[in-house]
Amino acid sequence: MAEGKFATSVTCMDGRIQLPLAKWIKENYSVDYVDAITEPGIDKKVAENNELDSIKTKVGISINAHKSQLIVVSGHYDCAGNPVSDEEHISQIKKDVDVISSWNT
């Protein structure tokens, strides 16, 4: 069993956002660690229910093994895996919240 308080970040693999996002999550949600689940353009994949088995399994591990009680879903500007407008990223992230909430892992 892992020690400390965990959160889960479902985010793009882009290295420009991972450290700043983990820092923001730690500072704003008082967690010690952030499990990072990454794929290129992950906000689009989840919104479109595309190749979700691996993502769902990893979220389940974070929740069950690390007792994560917070899942943060993100997208970002200039994403090579999902080059869409900010508005589209926001729309996809809103869908992602519904999809991930339905998993009950």
Model-predicted segments: where are they?
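Divalent-metal-activated hydrolytic enzyme cores
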Residues: 1-21, 29-33, 37-54, 61-70, ...
